[in-house]
């Protein structure tokens, strides 16, 4: 029988607190009086809540929003799980969150209505007969000790539980065949694979019959005298925000909103990135629905890093949520090898594949067959304020070096006037701060791996490059550089707060558009900076639309992505928004169009930068990999994300450059060791 005694309790989020609660109920503190300002205890439970998550996670944001709606202000203090619960139980904090329902827990707390939920299930190896499997005495299930209540454990009887200290340990046991299943939340398992165990992606799945929804609650301590009043106010406010769609919007923003089951037969479920061109596509797609009355489009528009994580995590646990995925030049060759993408071999003649820019088409193809269709493509370049340069009496070099950029940024940095010398990406993510750091490393003569696949993250070139980057943005960038990615810097520059910005060429269409930019008549451009070499100093990326092989609406999804990436779509955007706003970088015909050339003074440069990019030869020393700002291996998402986190910590003064790079090197060495062992 499943049971947790007090001696077994570990410091883990969801656990049986039976004996702890009994003891603490005997030593309760003096009640406090009802307050409009609340102090709550919580703990890290990624991806739902955590001190390192964006806005501290969806659950944190929901609780803050609900209490604000209830006219309460709130301060949240993070502890390890046991201390978070015990502190609230003892009356030191008015409430704790998130918790799951438990008979024992309810003796010391008043639980709110559900604020969110997670999907608890058994993760096992992919098996065509998994739907026929049953739990028996021979079934072995690994789980973190204390991670579920006795009630939840009983639902998996008569299986034998194998207790471990960490989910990562349980996952390795599953991979080696030492257990049949791991009992774990879906998103937790998926994120673990994405971040630390990428070689396990696609090997496992959650059989539907062994998965259930578990609600999360805010729990008010019964020793807080205002508990009942605040509980009622919280539940009422929660209900109002739910009816207004606020809760779903928060969950969606964090990539935690599942698609609803629908009786409609043809709902195309689309995941895309919250960039301007994609948001415009979503708006214009209403015309597509009018032309296809039997089709409904259901969108998830997400932050770039969250999109990447949710798409890969969907594949990691074989969920199959999406019909259309927005992916890039990194994913296509890797996912194609795993048979995760449907080939696009039946495109109509008028689609005109030969009109695609060669390097763009090649990056999305295998043996001549396309596996994704390009929505827009980009390189990187330097944007700068001509007016500020003229006022300072300086001139942008025809091909600037990074030393030039530092000199300019120092001269133009005027934060007291609301202008920063330079804006660069600093946000965590292999697609956020890594592209700028990686191309800088290339320019300084470095690489991710040498020809023997030995990681180079602790090399002198990496130290030089990252130190230069950190010093540059710390001295002459916005104080919140560590929070800024593409959209944040686009906003800063377009509103006149950056003298220099080095980022994607796709931003040019927005910066030169007077309807969307306050500096449209003041901005100009130059190539991305170089240093020891120009090789790999500017990146190549292709945001594209693909249909996963798991989609049940193959034909419908393919028809939609063909429409969204067609010449007709480009003409439609030009008609509605102007030629400067059309998705760039994909079709030769766009750059042959006199209307586009007239509207986009950057057109010739962007076409040349994209066309000349060479992902096969992007580093000064020979490298065993393809890719400019990324390495085209499955493990790079984990390596890039980890390295990104360490560099971000340096920007926040939490680590030194030496610490960040030595830890990144150690992580990469260990990961590649596991990869070789698993092959």
Tell me what each language-model feature is.
Residues 35-103, 107, 298-306, 310, ...:
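Extracytoplasmic small-molecule ligand-binding "clamshell" domains
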Residues 64, 76-136, 145-149, 204-211, ...:
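Acidic, polar ligand-binding/catalytic clefts
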Residues 109-116, 287-358, 363-365, 391-393, ...:
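Extracytoplasmic "Venus flytrap"/periplasmic binding protein-like
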Residues 153-157, 507-518, 531-641:
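C-terminal lobe and pocket-closing loops
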Residues 248, 252-262, 296, 390, ...:
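Conserved C-terminal helix/tail region of periplasmic/extracytoplasmic solute-binding proteins
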Residues 328-379, 403-404, 433-436, 520-526, ...:
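Hinge/lid segment of periplasmic solute-binding proteins
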Residues 371-375, 380, 406-455, 498:
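Extracytoplasmic/periplasmic solute-binding protein
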Residues 408-411, 451-483, 524, 528-529:
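Glycine-centered hinge/linker elements that transmit conformational signals in sensory
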């Amino acid at each position: 029988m499943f049971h947790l005694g007090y001696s077994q309790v570990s410091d883990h989020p969801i656990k049986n607190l039976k004996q702890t609660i009994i003891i603490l109920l005997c030593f309760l503190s003096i009640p406090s009086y009802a307050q409009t300002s609340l102090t709550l205890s919580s703990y890290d439970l990624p991806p739902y809540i955590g001190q390192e998550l964006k806005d501290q996670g969806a659950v944190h944001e929901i609780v803050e929003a609900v209490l604000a709606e209830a006219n309460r202000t709130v301060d949240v203090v993070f502890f390890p799980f046991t201390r978070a619960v015990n502190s609230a139980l003892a009356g030191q904090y008015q409430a704790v969150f998130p918790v799951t329902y438990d008979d024992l827990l309810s003796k010391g707390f008043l639980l709110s209505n559900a604020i969110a939920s997670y999907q608890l299930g058994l993760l096992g190896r992919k098996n065509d007969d998994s739907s026929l499997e049953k739990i028996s005495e021979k079934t072995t299930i690994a789980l973190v000790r204390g991670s579920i209540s006795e009630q939840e454990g009983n639902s998996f009887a008569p299986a034998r539980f194998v207790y471990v200290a960490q989910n990562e340990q349980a996952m390795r046991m599953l991979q080696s065949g030492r257990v049949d299943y791991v009992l774990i939340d879906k998103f937790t398992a998926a994120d673990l694979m994405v971040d630390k165990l990428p070689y396990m992606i696609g090997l496992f799945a959650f059989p539907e019959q062994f998965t259930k929804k578990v609600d999360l609650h805010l729990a008010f301590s019964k020793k807080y005298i205002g508990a009942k009043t605040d509980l009622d106010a919280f539940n009422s406010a929660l209900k109002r925000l739910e009816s207004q769609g606020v809760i779903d919007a928060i969950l969606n923003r964090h990539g935690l909103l599942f698609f609803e089951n629908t009786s409609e037969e043809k709902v195309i479920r689309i995941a895309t990135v919250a960039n301007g061109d994609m948001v415009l596509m979503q708006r214009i797609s209403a015309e597509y629905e009018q032309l296809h009355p039997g089709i409904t489009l259901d969108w998830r528009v997400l932050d770039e890093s969250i999109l990447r994580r949710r798409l890969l995590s969907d594949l990691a646990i074989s969920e199959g949520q999406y019909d259309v995925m927005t992916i890039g030049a990194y994913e296509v060759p890797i996912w194609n090898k795993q048979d995760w993408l449907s080939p696009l071999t039946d495109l109509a003649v008028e689609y005109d594949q030969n009109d695609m820019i060669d390097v763009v088409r090649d990056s999305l193809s295998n043996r001549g067959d396309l596996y994704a269709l390009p929505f827009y493509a980009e390189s990187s370049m330097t944007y700068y304020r001509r007016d500020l340069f003229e006022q300072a009496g300086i001139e942008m070099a025809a091909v600037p070096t990074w030393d030039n950029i530092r000199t300019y940024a120092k001269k133009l940095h005027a934060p007291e006037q609301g202008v920063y010398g330079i804006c660069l990406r600093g946000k965590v993510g292999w697609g956020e701060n890594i592209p700028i750091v990686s191309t800088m490393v290339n320019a300084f003569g470095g690489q991710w791996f040498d020809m023997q696949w030995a990681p180079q993250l602790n090399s002198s070139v990496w130290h030089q490059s990252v130190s230069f980057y950190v010093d540059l943005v710390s001295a002459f960038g916005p104080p919140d550089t560590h929070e800024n990615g593409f959209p944040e810097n686009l906003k800063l520059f377009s509103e006149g707060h950056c003298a220099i910005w080095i980022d994607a060429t796709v931003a040019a269409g927005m910066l030169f558009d007077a309807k969307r930019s306050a500096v449209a008549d003041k901005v100009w451009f130059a190539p991305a900076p170089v240093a020891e070499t120009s090789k790999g100093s500017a990146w190549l990326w292709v945001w594209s639309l693909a249909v996963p092989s798991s989609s049940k609406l193959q034909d419908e999804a393919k028809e939609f992505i063909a429409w969204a990436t067609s010449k007709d779509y480009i003409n439609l955007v030009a008609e509605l928004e102007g030629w400067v706003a059309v998705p760039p970088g994909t079709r030769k015909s766009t750059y042959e169009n006199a209307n586009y050339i007239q509207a986009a003074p950057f057109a010739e440069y962007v076409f040349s930068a994209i066309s000349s990019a060479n992902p096969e030869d992007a580093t000064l020393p020979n490298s065993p990999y393809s890719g400019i700002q990324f390495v085209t291996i499955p493990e790079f998402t984990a390596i890039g994300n980890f390295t990104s986190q360490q560099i971000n910590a340096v920007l926040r003064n939490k680590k030194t450059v030496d610490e960040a790079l030595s830890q990144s090197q150690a992580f990469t060495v260990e990961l590649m060791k596991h990869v070789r062992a698993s092959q």
